[in-house]
Curated annotation (Swiss-Prot):
Result, substituting residue 135 to Q: In ODG7; uncertain significance
Gene Ontology CC: one annotated term: mitochondrion
Name of the featured protein: Small ribosomal subunit protein mS22
Post-translational modification N6-acetyllysine, affected residues: 211
Pfam families attached to this UniProt entry: MRP-S22 (PF10245)
Record GO terms (molecular function): structural constituent of ribosome
Location in the cell: Mitochondrion
Tree of life domain: Eukaryota
Keyword set, alphabetical order: Acetylation, Disease variant, Mitochondrion, Phosphoprotein, Primary mitochondrial disease, Ribonucleoprotein, Ribosomal protein
GO biological process, one term: mitochondrial translation
Disease affiliated with this protein: Combined oxidative phosphorylation deficiency 5: A mitochondrial disease resulting in severe metabolic acidosis, edema, hypertrophic cardiomyopathy, tubulopathy, and hypotonia.
Species the sequence originates in: Homo sapiens (Human)
Gene: MRPS22
Length: 360
């Protein structure tokens, strides 16, 4: 038999029973004839299913039923407009080591150039994280070696640590005390990859900040952005925890009506996408009208029609060729859950606009 040339790491999981030592060592495995470590009787792929972007999933269906995705150019354009660009908010002071401030004397040209650079840097900071479908659980069993049952009391993880392999395709397997050899779950993969390829800001074990009671405390202090920043650093965008924390945060913002907390942040677009997908845009729409963001309100209804083209609102707007404020009125009369409230808010806005025009 040809020697096995892949270097693997052996790691005893943290979930082992009390009193059992954790083992970590590097070994180059050389199979021997008649030994326990033999080639598997059946062939299997060394890779793992890659995460499937929503656009790829949509392409598998028929062109007629293709649903717009988060990364579509039209969708991204609308979300970027609604996010806004507030340099004061984007570059607000962060908690860090105290240093004396730096003052510069600039000419008008230098000031304009510095402002331009700040705007470009802000656009990079406002780049929206991807919105992905939840990844499919890994339940692949590779072998059932009953001869190994009872020889160990802990699980062992074998990880291919070659640098040239993308993490999503990295081969990681788990040997159970029962003798079962299986592919590692996503959670086990994330922990092992963090052990051997540490990512800044990410912990091996999930921080306690993501416990329900701690999240409620953070929300009560209006620290929703901090929660999302920590979530983005800790979890993969298609993991169950990432999606769950984001949805909880969006729901809390909607309940409190504090949409402005995420405006001019990288998470505003994801929040809007969540509300539009779940047909819960009434609160955000009212907030935009009250803040004199009528263009954003129109864009919100436009995006709603893009995602729900067969709804009464989209059909009504198409029949009436509605634009601008009329687009909002059509939505309020057809699919809005708080239609009367939206119409009243819109009426108040128009009256204030008329008074302002008359005064000027």
């Amino acid at each position: 038999m040809a020697p096995l040339g892949t270097t693997v790491l052996l790691w005893s999981l943290l979930r082992s029973s009390p009193g059992v030592e954790r083992v970590c060592f590097r070994a180059r495995i050389q199979p021997w004839h008649g030994g326990l470590l033999q080639p598997l009787p059946c062939s299997f792929e060394m890779g793992l299913p890659r995460r499937r972007f929503s656009s790829e999933a949509a392409e598998s269906g028929s062109p007629e039923t293709k649903k717009p995705t988060f990364m579509d150019e039209e969708v991204q354009s609308i979300l970027t407009k609604m996010t806004g660009l507030n340099l004061q908010k984007t570059f607000k002071p962060a908690i860090q080591e105290l240093k004396p401030p730096t003052y510069k004397l600039m000419t008008q040209a230098q000031l304009e150039e510095a402002t331009r650079q700040a705007v470009e840097a802000a656009k990079v900071r406002l780049k929206m994280p991807p919105v992905l479908e939840e990844r499919v659980p890994i339940n692949d069993v590779l072998a059932e070696d009953k001869i190994l049952e009872g020889t160990e009391t802990t699980k062992y993880v074998f990880t291919d640590i070659s640098y040239s392999i993308p993490h999503r395709e990295r081969f990681i397997v788990v040997r159970e005390p029962s003798g079962t050899l299986r592919k590692a779950s996503w959670e086990e993969r994330d922990r092992m990859i963090q052990v051997y390829f540490p990512k800044e800001g990410r912990k091996i074990l999930t921080p306690i900040i993501f416990k329900e009671e701690n999240l409620r405390t953070m929300y009560s202090q209006d620290r929703h952005v901090d929660v999302l920043n920590l979530c983005f650093a800790q979890f993969e965008p298609d993991s169950t925890e990432y999606i769950k924390v984001h949805h909880k945060t969006y729901e809390d913002i909607d309940k409190r009506g504090k949409y402005d907390l995420l405006r001019s942040t990288r998470y505003f677009g994801g929040m809007v996408w969540y509300f539009v997908n779940n047909k819960k845009i009434d609160g955000l729409l009212i907030d935009q009208i009250q803040r004199d963001l009528i263009d954003d309100a129109t864009n919100l209804v436009q995006l709603y029609h893009v995602l729900h083209p067969d709804g009464q609102s989209a059909q009504g707007a198409k029949d009436q060729a509605a634009e601008g404020i009329n687009l909002i009125k059509v939505f309020a009369k057809t699919e809005a859950q708080k239609g009367a409230y939206i119409e009243l808010t819109l009426q108040t806005y128009q009256e204030a606009l008329s008074r302002h025009s008359a005064a000027s």
